[in-house]
């Protein structure tokens, strides 16, 4: 077996049971991985030098094909309502078949780190069948120094073999695609999908399981730091503006997607970014756009024209087109991946019902309530071609990656907020003056002005009113922001219609929260929205 590249000889790939391979490439850099990718016909080059790969039928994650091993260790610690169980026997059989399937193949190994905090990191070894997958994950996670590689010992291993097709009957799985996670042994097996995001989220899932037991809060969020060292954390589901609002030229970007919060402050889990590129433009997002124009970046499912120019407006393969690049491709990115204790937490929502104010201040109990709710509303087309808002609740702003019960994360968040006296804000980037179709999108200029006032501390001095439906505090006046948009009801021409829409949304919140009622105390229950009909 031919082995190439720097690695710890005492912790070679054979420690994972992988033997009789034709070749193993350890820790290759971008140039070598480009050469191997092209040699193997896995991807092509854009005119600017980015590596462009297609993932075939899977252009997103396969959450319905993800399984967690249910054993004595995980039995009482995993939220089984949200995680599909796999028996240890089925996993063992699958693992043996993965090892058999790998025989005679060339494999690529990247020895990487999840977590920029030395006390709360995991050494994650990622073994891939595809060379471009090796570059992808090298871009996304934290890369150890060349010296550190010689003594690197993996604590977690991911084996990604897209050509492996799972037999549903043999392993008790759903389809030919499988993502099997053994949290006890820290092994992840990915088969039957070429979508690279599965690898990144497997490390996130492992850290989301490991860290709460150490009192560290794992978060699906972006984070940045102001010139005075004040750290801000941004929670939000897809389409709420998390990436756009945290990419602020006046602040240092700590990371765009996954972070931990512990005794030393906030730290990035990753060493790169995985940004959406559909309709990306140099005007709207210059920093992200610039990364797509250079050597080392991986473009996933981006369409190239005949001159190999990327067409970011073309969603014919998928709307979920992406680019993966190291964090240092962004000019104002943090070199350490670490920030201090957060001064502000921003929970983003895009309320397409037009009911919520553009900003509200939350108490720690309200912050826990809204964190557990994880609300946004997207606009979905109905069969008649009419579009209407659809509420989405994804607990902890990232339900698919949370192995433990949401209340564990919620209680930890609430404790840290109280301990560090963090200001919490709910920011609505959705609609004002009516629901989608009647009202208009919240002006980004207003959102940025409100956010700036929250982050610099001046918003704390504003006069606040209590929202009659949601019970949170809403500023009455903010310099540079039209006062009318601060009171959503006043922006609706039809006040009765607003009250009806507000009642509808409040009822959705209440109904969604029923499953958490028995896991929270009275203070959090009392933070629930309730209809108190406003006077004309």
Curated annotation (Swiss-Prot):
This protein's name: Phosphoenolpyruvate carboxykinase (ATP)
Binding site for substrate: 61, 195, 201, 322
Residues reported in the UniProt entry to bind ATP: 201, 220, 236-244, 285, 322, 447
SUPFAM superfamilies: PEP carboxykinase N-terminal domain (SSF68923), PEP carboxykinase-like (SSF53795)
Gene (name only): pckA
CDD domains: PEPCK_ATP
Function of the molecule: Involved in the gluconeogenesis. Catalyzes the conversion of oxaloacetate (OAA) to phosphoenolpyruvate (PEP) through direct phosphoryl transfer between the nucleoside triphosphate and OAA.
Taxonomic lineage: Bacteria, Pseudomonadati, Pseudomonadota, Alphaproteobacteria, Hyphomicrobiales
Domain of life the protein comes from: Bacteria
GO molecular function, one term: metal ion binding
One Gene Ontology CC term in the entry: cytosol
Organism listed in the record: Brucella melitensis biotype 1 (strain ATCC 23456 / CCUG 17765 / NCTC 10094 / 16M)
Family statement: Belongs to the phosphoenolpyruvate carboxykinase (ATP) family.
């Amino acid at each position: 077996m031919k082995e190439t590249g720097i690695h710890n000889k005492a912790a070679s790939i054979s420690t994972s049971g992988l033997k009789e391979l034709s070749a193993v490439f350890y820790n290759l850099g971008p140039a070598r991985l480009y050469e191997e990718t092209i040699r193997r016909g896995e991807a092509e080059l854009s005119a600017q030098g980015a590596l462009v790969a297609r993932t075939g039928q899977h252009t997103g994650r396969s959450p319905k094909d993800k399984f967690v091993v249910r054993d004595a260790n995980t039995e009482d610690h995993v939220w089984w309502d949200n995680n599909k169980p796999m028996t240890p026997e089925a996993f063992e059989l699958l693992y043996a078949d993965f090892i058999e399937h790998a025989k005679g193949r060339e494999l690529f190994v990247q020895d990487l780190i999840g977590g920029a905090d030395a006390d709360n990191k995991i050494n994650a070894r990622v073994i891939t069948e595809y060379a471009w997958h090796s570059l992808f994950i090298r871009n996304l996670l934290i890369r150890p120094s060349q010296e550190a590689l010689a003594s690197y010992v993996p604590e977690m291993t991911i084996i990604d073999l897209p050509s492996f097709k799972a037999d549903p009957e043999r392993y008790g799985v759903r389809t030919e695609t499988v993502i099997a996670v053994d949290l006890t042994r820290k092994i992840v097996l990915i088969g039957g999908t070429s979508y690279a995001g599965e690898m990144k989220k497997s490390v996130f899932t492992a850290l989301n399981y490991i860290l709460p037991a150490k009192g560290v809060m794992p978060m699906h969020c972006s984070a940045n730091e102001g010139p005075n060292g004040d750290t801000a954390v941004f929670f939000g589901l897809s389409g709420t503006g998390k990436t756009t609002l945290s990419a602020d030229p006046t602040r240092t970007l700590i990371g765009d997607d996954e972070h931990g919060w512990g005794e030393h402050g906030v730290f990035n889990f990753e060493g790169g970014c995985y940004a959406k590129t559909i309709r990306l433009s140099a005007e709207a997002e210059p920093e992200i756009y610039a990364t797509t124009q250079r050597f080392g970046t991986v473009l996933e499912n981006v369409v190239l024209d005949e001159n190999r120019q990327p067409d970011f407006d073309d969603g014919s393969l998928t709307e979920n087109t992406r680019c993966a690049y190291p964090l240092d491709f962004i000019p104002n990115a943090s070199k350490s991946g670490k920030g201090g204790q957060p001064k502000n937490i921003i929970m983003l929502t895009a309320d397409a019902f037009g009911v919520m104010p553009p900003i509200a201040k939350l108490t720690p109990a309200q912050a826990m309530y809204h964190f557990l709710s994880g609300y946004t509303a997207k606009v979905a087309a109905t069969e008649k071609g009419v579009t209407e808002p659809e509420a989405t609740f994804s607990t902890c702003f990232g339900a698919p990656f949370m192995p433990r019960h949401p209340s564990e994360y919620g209680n930890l968040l609430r404790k840290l907020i109280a301990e560090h006296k963090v200001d919490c804000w709910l920011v609505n980037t959705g609609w004002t003056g009516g629901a989608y179709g009647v009202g208009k999108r919240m002006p980004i200029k207003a959102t940025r002005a409100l956010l700036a006032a929250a982050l610099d501390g001046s918003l704390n001095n504003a006069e606040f009113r209590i929202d009659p439906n949601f019970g949170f505090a809403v500023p009455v006046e903010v310099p540079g922001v039209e006062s009318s948009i601060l009171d959503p009801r006043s922006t609706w021409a039809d006040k009765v219609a607003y009250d009806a829409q507000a009642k509808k949304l409040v009822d959705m919140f209440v109904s969604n929260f029923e499953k958490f009622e028995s896991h929270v105390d009275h203070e959090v229950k009392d933070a629930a929205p309730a209809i108190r009909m406003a006077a004309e």
